[in-house]
Amino acid sequence: MSSAETMKQPTAASPDQFSVSHLLSAVESEISAGSEKGDPTERDLKITLEEKPLWDKFNALTNEMIVTKNGRRMFPVLKVNVSGLDPNAMYSFLLDFTAADNHRWKYVNGEWVPGGKPEPSVPSCVYIHPDSPNFGAHWMKSPVSFSKVKLTNKLNGGGQIMLNSLHKYEPRLHIIKVGGPDNQRMVSTHTFPETQFIAVTAYQNEEITALKIKYNPFAKAFLDAKERSDGKDGMEDLQDQPQYSQLGGWFLPGTGPICPPPNPHQFAPSLGLPSHGCDRYSTLRNHRSAPYPHPYQRSSPPTNYGHDTAASLPMMPTHDNWSGLPVSTHNMLSMSAMPHTTTSTHAQYPNLWSVSNNNLTPTTHAQTHMSGTMGTGLPHQFLRTTAPAPYHSIPTCTVPTTASSSPVYHDSHEVSSTDSGYGHSTTPPAPQTRITSNNWSPMTPPSL
């Protein structure tokens, strides 16, 4: 190795020297951050409780702290402001809990009352602040928070504080000066009466619970989760309710027990299926809509009418022994005699139902007009469809009332389209086809 290479070695270490000086300057700035509050003599040491008004609110109601097997953090969090330490000296901050009285507590009739002798005291557990040890300047530059301390009712170690449930405790802060085996000494021990609490496994006072939720940001997250859960339950309850409106009106199940034959007066106003065999379909009767939308397009304010035959039509289940339904001509009343307030502009009789053996088929009025007969098709379950309106208006018609008429038409009378408030076209109306008895085959009810 030449002398020239030996002369270059000191210059190679200059970057390291610059790095060390940079680190030392960072440490010095850290120490000087809280030096303005310092006192090398420690004679003016002051310790004040942070968030004292919040603690006072809890203390007025007798504060409660949850203890669990795995440990639960405190709220409010114990925070203190410290001043008067030696900025260049090293200190450790410790926390323990002492019994506030000599009896056990119980919650009776909305208040805490003494409930007997206390349990034997357990060995006092001490919590060491994770920043310990550190310079006095470090402890004085910002509030010292004990947010990570956990309270438990089981002696499991791990730096947790074990407490007896239903006993009242008071936190106690210790400041110890460190720096060598011979220099350790207790600087101060301080307590705050407003931080007393009763250890519980579940909150007893609802007002304490409300304060915890109001001021604890983590408890607010719990409250939001609970509200979402309640809302979901409410949606599930709504989803569990029968939803038949989207089926388009009539819903006839093709499985399950068959209902007995309905009353021969098929269209009586008060007719309903027998309760002894059709209880399982009671909700369908309550939720189904009218099978025939109204054919009129209203051009003036509606007139109130109390007559509605849609609610009186019974639900007709399929049956193997039914060959047809006898319907007389006087039962097929024109819809102009029974207007009701609706804004539907669909066709008159958008679909009709024919019952033959096990098939119930919807057929449009146009198909009936052209063929004069009912078709067969969809088995068991049916969805009502709509067809375009073949008529612009309904002419005035007069329906005679006879003694043999069905009870539903006992109050039938002549109704004029002008009187009812419905507009009519000046063009001649299209011919209408009325359903007569020859469109239906005789029915023989099965023997019971």
UniProtKB/Swiss-Prot annotation:
The keyword Cell membrane does not apply. It comes from the Eukaryota. Involved in the transcriptional regulation of genes required for mesoderm formation and differentiation. SMART domains: TBOX (SM00425). Keywords: Developmental protein, DNA-binding, Nucleus, Transcription, Transcription regulation. It is found in: Nucleus. GO terms for cellular component: chromatin; nucleus. One of its GO terms (biological process) is heart morphogenesis. This is T-box transcription factor T homolog 1. The keyword Transcription applies. Residues 290-312, 401-448 are annotated as: Disordered. SUPFAM superfamilies: p53-like transcription factors (SSF49417). Residues 54-224 bind DNA. The gene is TBXT. Residues 417-442 have a biased composition (Polar residues). InterPro entries: p53-like_TF_DNA-bd_sf, T-box_DNA-bd, T-box_sf, TF_Brachyury, TF_T-box, TF_T-box_CS. GO terms for molecular function: DNA-binding transcription factor activity, RNA polymerase II-specific; RNA polymerase II cis-regulatory region sequence-specific DNA binding. Pfam families: T-box.
